[in-house]
Amino acid sequence: MLKITRRKFLGSALAAGLCSRSSFAQQEKLRIGVTDWNLHLGANPEALPMAANLGFEGVQISFGRTLVDGEMPADNPEVIARYLALSRQYKIPIDGTCVDKLHDNGLKSDPLAAKWVLDSIRLTRALDTKVLLLPFFGRWALQTKQEMDYAGDALRDLAVEATKAGVILGLEDTISAEDNVRIMERSQSSSVLVYYDVGNSTVAGFDPVKEIRWLGKSRICQFHLKDNPHYLGEGSIQFLPIMRAIRDIQFSGYANLEADAPSKQLEADMRRNLAFIRNVMAQS
């Protein structure tokens, strides 16, 4: 695999910024967004102006984990109205959502998880967006066939409501592409897709390039791009082959940066990571 060095990146950044016709431009546009939690503004509408000022093309918002009157923090008409107003004002889309409450009540076995997913489907529709990320991590990570089957069965019922709302349920986890497809098939719904995280897959020992090409655009709803705790391009993940694979499957939509800020200078680090990935896209 070809690796982009930082020297090469810095030397070509200006040219990439001026480039108006990359290979990605020949297909429907891949847009680069950012997660609100990596802006340290989880479940906070102020993530939208910050992301816009940093140059991102969308924001993936989380609904929050610390309940307010028994509901997720974003489950409030005034909060939803604020999100929509800021999205219009700063001309930046809400590109997707995340039911991060599943970190507390996981869908692999906790009956309470269904409530948070159903509420999040409703909120996702209210925010006029389509992709709802369902995380399976920590003690809620999928590890056994029984757990995967339980998740698939739970998704079968939840997907009915997602389909009615025009919402896609995106599975983000640490299992293989093949196991994710088995869950999708068990759900019996085209509204259940893979939310592909290149960092999680690499750490779990899978080959992102191979998996992205095998899954194809029809089974992936969005991407997370990261190589934490490093800057993009300075860790072990080689992004040029990954971005070429995304291009080659003709994926269009959003890839959200879920990248850390290694220097703790949040805005500078976010700009640096965004510039890097756009440079890679220009070379793809």
Annotate each predicted stretch with a short phrase.
Residues 30-35, 59-61, 94-99, 132-134, ...:
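Hydrophobic faces of well-ordered beta-strands that scaffold small-molecule active sites
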Residues 74-80, 110-118, 147-155, 207-213, ...:
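Charged helix-capping and loop-helix junction motifs
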Residues 34-35, 68-71, 104-108, 144-146, ...:
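Short, contiguous strand/loop micro-motifs
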Residues 62-82, 138-143:
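Glycine-rich, proline-tolerant flexible connector loops at the mouths of alpha/beta enzymes
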Residues 67-74, 91-99, 130-135, 168-172, ...:
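Low-complexity, flexible helical/coil segments
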Residues 14-18, 46-48, 52, 86-96, ...:
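Active-site acidic/histidine proton-transfer and metal-coordination neighborhood
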Residues 38, 63-65, 100-103, 136-140, ...:
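Active-site-proximal loop/turn and secondary-structure-junction residues that shape catalytic pockets
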Residues 2-19, 24-31, 40-54, 177-284:
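Histidine-acidic metal/acid-base catalytic patches
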